[in-house]
Regions:
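Short basic, glycine-rich beta-strand/loop surfaces that mediate nucleic-acid
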Residues: 63-64, 68-122
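Short charge-dense sequence patches
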Residues: 13-20, 60-68
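Short, functional N-terminal and low-complexity linear motifs
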Residues: 4-10, 54, 77-84
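Residue-level signature of catalytic and energy-coupling elements of molecular machines
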Residues: 35, 51, 70
Length: 123
């Protein structure tokens, strides 16, 4: 199956798992924004430290602007396979198309590790 248009690079499974772990810890001890509207606002305000997007979002127009916005604001971003898992990691009973990490809480080291790998993903 072809990747959606908003998926600009492949995120290794290990890194996707770390991103989900980061979302979970940040939702419990830090501050996150869930959903495309909230992610867009926190990215435009340059509050987001990292954006995590699901690859199985339909319609794709929901997320198509997020990677461009992140690059403009120099915010690292990664992808995870399933929106249901992203929602669960954010502490929701429903799925989430995207999550912005605003304050990582106890996951600061994990955030820094993921953000450091971002430049190599885009090649």
């Amino acid at each position: 199956m072809a990747r959606p248009i908003y998926v600009r690079f492949e995120t290794p499974t290990e890194l996707s798992d770390k991103a989900l772990q980061l979302v979970q810890v940040a939702s419990e001890t830090g501050k996150i924004r869930v959903g495309t509207n909230e992610v867009t606002k926190s990215s435009e305000r340059a509050e987001a430290k990292l954006v995590v997007m699901a690859e199985d979002v339909d319609p794709v127009e929901i997320l198509v602007h997020i990677p461009m916005l992140c690059e403009e604001k120099r915010i690292p971003y990664v992808y995870v396979g399933k929106k249901q898992r992203l929602g669960q990691s954010a502490g929701l009973s429903k799925s989430a198309a995207s999550v912005a990490i605003v304050e990582p809480g106890d996951a600061k080291a994990l955030l820094e590790e993921i953000a450091a790998q971002f430049p190599t993903l885009k090649k």
